[in-house]
Regions:
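Charge-rich, low-complexity linker and terminal segments
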Residues: 1-26, 50, 86-91, 95-182
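A positional/architectural concept
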Residues: 1-75
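Short secondary-structure boundary micro-motifs
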Residues: 39-42, 60-62, 79-80, 90-91, ...
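Mature extracytoplasmic or otherwise solvent-exposed domains
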Residues: 45, 59, 71-73, 82-88, ...
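The −1 position to Zn-ligating cysteines in a subset of zinc-ribbon hairpins
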Residues: 77-80, 137
Length: 182
């Protein structure tokens, strides 16, 4: 452990002692982490907000499987009208925690608990919308002046027809061949 790294996700331990006693037993859980300073350039999680998972852990032979829905509050600017917009992104998760985790695939199971902090942190980052809209049909600040369907300014500069002719479909067929003469 290097420890103390800036931006390290907070720990959020979930005890799995009870369910580990009987294969297949389940337990409802609602772990959460409080985040500060999480966000992308245009969208972020408001400081102090909680990322909450509502789900359950189930005992399996390799360890435990965690399933549920992660709720991620966010705020940003509408990409069309630039008004402030807020929302809650919801992401389904299904993750396996085991004593011998596979790098990049499963998470560590430590004795009698799992740490879901890193999962909540990573899931929240991926859940943030890249281009938020205040509403699906937001028309922008002045729809008459800036229609969302762009008309090219270059339409009247045409100097003859220089568009490529349609490609002979026989050439396309040849693209897939390996022209190895042996
Ligand atoms: Zn808008």
């Amino acid at each position: 452990m290097t420890g103390g790294a800036e931006g390290h996700p907070p720990r959020e331990l979930v005890s799995v002692t009870e369910i580990r006693r009987h294969l297949g037993s389940r337990l409802a859980v609602t772990p959460s982490i409080e985040v500060v300073g999480m966000g992308l350039s245009d969208v972020r999680v408001p400081d102090g907000s909680e990322i909450v998972l509502t789900g359950e852990v189930e005992s399996i032979s390799e360890g435990v499987v965690l399933t549920g829905t992660v709720a991620v509050p966010w705020t940003g600017a509408c990409r069309r009208c630039l008004n402030d917009v807020t929302g809650v992104a919801e992401v389904e998760v299904r993750e396996i925690y085991e004593t011998d985790p596979v790098e990049g695939e499963t998470w560590p199971l430590e004795q009698d608990h799992i740490d879901v902090g890193p999962l909540l942190h990573d899931t929240a980052l991926l859940a943030l919308p890249l281009a938020p809209l205040c509403s699906d049909d937001c028309a922008g600040p002045a729809p008459g002046l800036y229609p969302t369907t762009v008309v090219s300014d270059d339409a009247d500069l045409g100097e003859g027809d220089d568009a490529e002719p349609p490609r002979d479909p026989r050439w396309a067929a040849l693209d897939g061949l390996d022209l190895d003469e042996g």
